């Protein structure tokens, strides 16, 4: 996931990393687990994601999140109490832009996104969701929720049930996948 100010563990620019991976690969899908949307301008994200999806020739999966670190919100001057509203506003605008609606209109002149994403109308979207409000928000958009690596299997089962109920309440179709993050360690040492 996107991670700022974490020393060697930092990943502050996941889209740039994926662009490098897209240039070196041809068949694997490429994705973010959680690009932090509330700290970014939705037009910039829509443009960068469309370009990345073109470079990746439709292999992009865009995982989005709201963020959780107080330091992150302080540095980017975002009120953390507004993160859900900003997320909803930004993603709604991005979906509109990717669908071909004008980015901006003044008088008789309209501005549109170019190039559009390779996938139509936009890349596959996953929304990181670790609590009831986030699960409802993912369901409202009809996007798969990206389960936390911190959830136990019992919590995962409970959250999946909440998510499915929220999908039904939002009159959304069950997505084909439920992405789950898990941390694994690979070593030659059996210990």
Where are these regions (language model features)?
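Active-site-adjacent structural elements that line small-molecule/cofactor binding pockets in enzymes
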Residues: 1-191
